[in-house]
Regions:
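A ligand-binding cleft/hinge motif common to bilobed small-molecule-binding domains
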Residues: 89, 95, 105-115, 163-167, ...
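Bilobed "Venus flytrap"/periplasmic-binding protein-like clamshell domains
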Residues: 46-49, 58-73, 129-186, 205-207
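C-terminal motif of bacterial Sec signal peptides marking the signal peptidase cleavage site
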Residues: 19-22
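Extracytoplasmic small-molecule ligand-binding "clamshell" domains
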Residues: 31-106, 182
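Acidic, polar ligand-binding/catalytic clefts
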Residues: 81-145
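Extended ligand-binding regions for polar small-molecule ligands
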Residues: 65-75, 136, 143-146, 150-154, ...
């Protein structure tokens, strides 16, 4: 009799635990319609401030990251896990399927279309410019830079900034920028210019502001010696793994909803100090 009661108690306890686990799993893994939630890994370059970085509390943030958080809120069928990593690991990881999507202030290039899915809707806008010494502040664009015969900080061939300069050179064969492919993905442009190793370099405005104009930045002491001159505003994109077309399509629908509001404008102002969407009509790339 005692053994029978013990067996009955064990069976009841096991059933109760099973029900609790099932309920718990159901809440975490299904939508309000009872459909399964797809968990996806969103990689971000953790050193790409203000586009993608880790804040003082250890949380992922930046323009690209915050937009993807809004996308996550809209997409009930998906659950995002943000994974901070390096630029190289992001590119390799998304291509190989370690991550389903990656954000890193990425520009579109023909080469990248062979490795990643580019969605229909862009993620944001980024200001690209020339960093030069104050005495060369009259150099406003790539044409000025080329005409002056200035030397440019090297850019890795797989860096989309290299493609931007290469496209300019192709369109201007008689006034080309001296473009040198670097071994590293990017170099410390401000340092190279300040030391006189080159006459100028290409940098994203957000990065320049964080390094030079922001109090406490590593080169804030050079704020009166180094200048940034914007030469283009360029669309930026999330990079999806080649097998994630359905996910990319879902992203497109969510971003379309967000673009009908002022959410992206506000994030641009928050992280870049200005609403880059105001010049969207003049963006060529």
């Amino acid at each position: 009799m005692l053994i029978k009661k013990i067996l009955q108690f064990t069976a009841i306890s096991f059933a109760a635990v099973s029900i609790l686990v099932a309920c718990s799993d159901g809440e975490a893994a299904t939508t309000s319609n009872g459909e399964a939630v797809k968990k996806v890994k969103v990689a971000y370059d953790q050193s790409g401030k203000p586009m993608t970085y880790i804040d003082e509390n250890g949380n992922p943030t930046g323009y690209d990251v915050e937009v993807m958080k809004l996308v996550d809120e809209i997409l009930e069928d998906y659950e995002f896990e943000f994974v901070g990593t390096s630029n190289d690991d992001l590119l390799i990881g998304v291509e190989q399927g370690k991550y389903q999507v990656g954000v890193k202030n990425a520009f579109w290039t023909e080469e990248r279309t062979a490795k990643f899915i580019f969605p229909q809707e862009f993620l944001g806008l980024s200001s690209a410019g020339l960093v030069v010494k104050k005495e060369n502040a009259h150099i406003k664009n790539l044409s000025d830079f080329a005409s002056a015969g200035f030397t440019l900080a090297p850019i890795a061939a797989n860096n989309a900034q290299y493609t931007v300069i290469a496209e300019y050179n192709e369109a201007n064969p008689d006034n080309q920028v001296k473009l040198q492919a670097g071994e590293e993905f990017s170099v410390d442009v401000v340092q190279w210019v300040n030391e006189g190793r080159v006459d100028g370099g290409v940098q994203i405005e957000g990065s320049f502001n964080g390094q030079v104009l922001t109090e406490g930045g590593p080169y804030h002491h050079l704020k009166d010696e180094i200048v940034y001159n914007e030469f283009a505003v360029i669309k930026t994109w999330p990079l999806f793994n080649k097998k994630e077309q359905e996910f990319a399509d879902a992203y497109d629908k969510a971003i379309q909803q967000l673009k009908e509001t002022d959410a992206l404008n506000k994030l641009s102002e928050q992280f870049y100090g200005k609403d880059l969407f105001k010049v969207l009509d003049s963006v060529k790339r």
